[in-house]
Amino acid sequence: INCRASLNSCFHNACVANTNDENFSHYEAGADHFVNLLFTFDEKEELTGAIINVPCPSQNTENEYYLSADYWNDVRIAIRKKYGDIYLLPQCAAAGDLAPRILHYKQAQDRRFRLKYGESFAEKGLERTARQDIAERIAAAFDEVYAWASKEKKREARITHVVETVQLSKRLISDEEYAYAKQGYAQEMAKEYRTDGDPQERLFQNSVLYSLRNRYKGIIDRYEAQKEQPKFPMELHVIGLDDVAFASNQFELYMDYQHRIQARSPFVQTFVVQLAGQSGEGGGSYLCTQRGFEGRGYSASMYCNLVSPAGGQELVEETVRLLKEIRASQEE
């Protein structure tokens, strides 16, 4: 699980960029090595499934056009090979600034894959081999944790589920950004959709044009609405299951926010679940930290952030508040 954005000495970040650069300084984010697991059993105490919470997006295979569960498909294969056809529920923990690929030491990784997998590496290629490698590491974590976690099976558990709509400070659009968006929107609206040529090329080019128009239009709409609506409503779910908790958000949430929540949570384990909630254009945007915002990468741009870093901290505070309230009610 590695950083998504790198920072050069000019203090400007780039997403998944080449780090073999004389201006490369450091990675913007750190890394989160925790895999949170919750196992389920039947009345005979036989394993029936597990929740696997990993702070890493399932986007190892990119720039290919087919439906795929990415490394989660490989995870299911690896775990079910040993434990049978159990149910596995993947969760993506906060990982807005993390990615399932390394950004330096690539030659060393190639050598490892070549020696570890042999001809299979040549047949599958880098990306699919990396998926298999990730799956094997998650499966190894599953084995290790199951060996001791299975000693503490619970037949009863107190469950508390709280849902609140929290109001988060928006990422406001400046006058300059508004003017830029209006100009860009006018330019894209002056272009016409293609109606001839190869269908695949036509679909691609028309999709790009449609996307660019919507991108600029979204900025214009946000600017015009933000004076009367400076807050962004988000449906927050927090669940207490004895000494384990789950807290959702709808964003690609930067890692630091998760650590702030987990560090202050009164529960033994707190599963943070990102991209859980509203779908479509109103959900799933990045929520960067102040550090990310200042780095000016694409995931911190006006297009990709509906909520500001201040709103991100508000999400932390609201989540921690509910976690503490639920834990206190369980102890009454």
Model-derived features: where do they sit?
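Non-catalytic substrate/cofactor recognition surfaces at enzyme active-site rims
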Residues: 1-332
